[in-house]
Amino acid sequence: MVKMVETAPTRRGLLKTAGALAGAMVVPDAVSAAMRATEQVPLPSSRLAPVRPAPRVEPRSSRVVKPELMRQALAALEQHGSAIKLRDRMVIADFAASSSQPRFHFIDLVSGTSVSKLVAHGSGSDPGHTGYLQRFSNRDGSNASCEGAFLASDYYVGKHGKSQRLIGLDPTNNNALSRAIVVHGAWYSNPDMIRTHGRLGRSQGCFAVGERELAEVFDRLGQGRMIYAAKI
């Protein structure tokens, strides 16, 4: 049978316990004293340098686009500045070139670099299907491409799959939204059309790009940037 033995606290143990409690009480007093000392130290007055506005970056031209077409596009960017929120990049559709040529130019206005893609024009702009745009039209039902500055707007899914709405900013294309002139992918804008037929197919006025190119086109264009379409 185990006998429980109770031991009375020794004098040495009591002294150790009292010392520990006294030390714990000293810590808050030391912290308070340190805080009071810090509060009494005068801090130097802070004089922040005035914030300068970010310098305006002059857009750099692309060597791929004709100088006159580039000048027109930059002028349109300035003219519609309040509507176009993003001005680091823009897209130029050079409809003087054949549809067999990469003529949809994505231009970085900071670096001056560019990436070019194939893009179809409207059947009403090229009735004979020559591969060259003959005329523009803003008329509903014309199935023609229209010229001028467009604002890249929101995305939606329609009969051509994922598409991006465009808002026409000029009198020559201000029916673009009601005509459903959009950016979308299409089989007739794939590169194999050029190998087979020597030119792309035609849209109903939309900027139709290759199906495999669509994701990159959306990524580079984004929302709030400008497309400028012209023939010079």
Task: Place the predicted regions along the sequence by residue.
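N-terminal targeting pre-sequences for secretion and organelle import
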Residues: 204-232
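N-terminal secretory signal peptides and thylakoid transit peptides that target proteins
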Residues: 2-22
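Cysteine-nucleophile amide-bond enzymes
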Residues: 21-24, 28, 61
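NTP/phosphate- and nucleic-acid-binding module
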Residues: 10, 25-27, 45-46
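Signal peptide processing junction and immediate N-terminal pro/mature segment
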Residues: 30-42
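Cell wall/extracellular polymer interaction/catalysis modules
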Residues: 40-203, 212-215, 219
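Gly/Ser/Thr-rich helix-start
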Residues: 24, 149, 206
